[in-house]
């Protein structure tokens, strides 16, 4: 979208109307009609507000391609999307594909770009209508999310999208190999495209720059920040913390995030007798993340299978020394951090202890990490 000769149309389930549209057009799937309704201009304008131009609504209405009157729609003939992960997720994926059929018939475009399995059916639908090339962007696979206990329905949707794709963009070489080996894709159409982070804005820099010098902090803080699911390896973080606390007591551990393993992790910390050194603040967002990273002396990402892993870049950007698992995509491009196997809790404990007690190591990882990211 930064190229002057490129025009982007971004189709999202549920816009709020305050999105930045200076560099792309936004079409809300919740505002795209699939059932013809006889509604006047003023009413459409009042109902849609800043979410969609009424003229676009009418243009889309003219491209309804089938009788969907049996489906539940609102007074504008639109399907409502939650914008979240509801219990009827498969229904929402199918509905998204139906709506995509209207947009694909009305819009003009050269390339279709579908992000992750939730939008693959919509991408396939658009390709079948237009004959335009389909790029699927693999941010993660069910092999990553499930530790190999793959959901066959999800797998089939993922594979179908990849089979129909003209190009498969993977967030790392690690993910690319999974796509080739487990989804049986042609290596020639699979490419690795690593993620990145934006430079910190001034208000975030103001937070980060409040970090206390190493010598002023008698008690060090070690942080895990992410979903508490088996993919992220939270149990290895707690086991490593237990080993660190057998050697020193001037360290506290923060496990920030939420997920289906949260209660299990709280119990594990209690069983190891280290609950008094642990904090479980729950899910964080926005400035809370940077406040947490600013107060952290070590950041640990012990993921069992991480397609990329953006959080280490955010931590290093804040000057927080970082430890990551070798089983992560970001390990392919990051050098000024400590890399180890997720299961090697002895090495993880040694790395945490060393950073917390060696000022030179702390400063090197902090300074070089900022420079590298």
List each language-model region with its residue ranges.
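A conserved catalytic-core segment of Leloir-type glycosyltransferases
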Residues: 7-104
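Conserved donor-binding/catalytic core segment of Leloir-type glycosyltransferases
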Residues: 169, 215-232, 238-241, 366
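Carbohydrate-associated surface elements
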Residues: 174, 196
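Nucleotide-activated donor-binding/catalytic signature segment of Leloir-type glycosyltransferases, i.e.
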Residues: 263-284
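Aromatic "clamp/platform" in nucleotide-sugar-dependent glycosyltransferases that forms part
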Residues: 304
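Short hydrophobic beta-strand element within catalytic cores of glycosyltransferases
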Residues: 321-324
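Conserved acidic donor-binding segment of nucleotide-sugar-dependent glycosyltransferases
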Residues: 337-345, 354-359
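A short, well-ordered alpha-helix in the C-terminal region of glycosyltransferases
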Residues: 347, 354, 361-373
């Amino acid at each position: 979208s930064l190229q002057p000769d490129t025009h982007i149309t971004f189709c999202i389930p549920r816009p709020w109307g305050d999105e930045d549209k200076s560099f792309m057009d936004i079409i809300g799937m919740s505002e795209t009609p699939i059932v013809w309704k006889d509604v006047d201009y003023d009413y459409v304008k009042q109902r849609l507000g800043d979410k969609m131009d009424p003229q676009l609504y009418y243009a889309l209405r003219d491209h309804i391609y089938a009788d969907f009157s049996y489906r539940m729609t609102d007074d504008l003939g639109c399907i409502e999307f939650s914008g979240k992960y509801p219990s009827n997720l498969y229904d929402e994926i199918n509905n998204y594909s139906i709506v995509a059929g209207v947009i694909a018939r009305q819009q003009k475009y050269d390339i279709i770009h579908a992000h992750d399995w939730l939008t693959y059916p919509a991408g396939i639908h658009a390709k079948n209508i237009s004959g335009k090339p389909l790029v699927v962007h693999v941010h993660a696979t069910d092999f990553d999310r499930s530790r190999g206990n793959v959901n066959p329905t999800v797998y089939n949707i993922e594979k179908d999208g990849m089979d129909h794709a003209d190009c498969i963009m993977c967030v790392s070489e690690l993910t690319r190999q999974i796509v080739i080996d487990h989804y049986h894709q042609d290596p020639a159409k699979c490419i690795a495209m690593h993620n990145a982070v934006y430079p910190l804005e001034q208000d975030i820099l103001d937070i980060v720059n409040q970090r206390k010098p190493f010598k002023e902090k008698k008690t060090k803080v070690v942080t895990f920040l992410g979903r508490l699911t088996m993919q992220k390896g939270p149990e290895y973080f707690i086991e490593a913390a237990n080993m660190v606390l057998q050697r020193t007591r001037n360290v506290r551990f923060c496990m920030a995030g939420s997920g289906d393993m949260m209660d299990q992790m709280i119990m594990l910390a209690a069983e190891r007798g280290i609950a008094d050194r642990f904090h479980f603040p729950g899910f964080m967002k926005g400035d809370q993340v940077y406040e947490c990273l600013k107060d952290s002396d070590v950041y640990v990402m012990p993921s069992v299978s991480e397609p990329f892993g953006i959080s280490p870049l955010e931590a290093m950007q804040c000057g927080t020394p970082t430890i990551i698992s070798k089983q992560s995509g970001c390990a392919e491009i990051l050098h000024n951090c400590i890399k180890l196997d997720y299961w090697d809790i002895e090495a993880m404990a040694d790395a945490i202890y060393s950073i917390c007690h060696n000022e030179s190591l702390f400063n090197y990882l902090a300074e070089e990490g900022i420079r590298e990211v």
